């Protein structure tokens, strides 16, 4: 069931798109290509809604929908990552479309959605 992103979710995703490091920084050859790719993602932000939440019960991770539709696993997946004191935040992007926001806790800690200022890039 799709729902609108909260303002905190939207800000977190925007910060991840803008500043998070790619797990494979060699995916694109130039800084300009990366900047254009990030700009395309930011322009898509208004079309993103929240889908299914993770069922682990310890994290606020959730599926991202574009135009209220699930994003299919792509041939070209880029993972943007940032750290928080309690864990790791990852934004999965499949074929240029954000597909999942993962907030992975350290050990057995239960996490709430982190504030964008908590991100360590």
Identify the function of each model-found stretch.
Residues 1-79, 113-121:
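N-terminal domain-onset segments
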Residues 80-121:
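Short, compact, well-ordered microdomains
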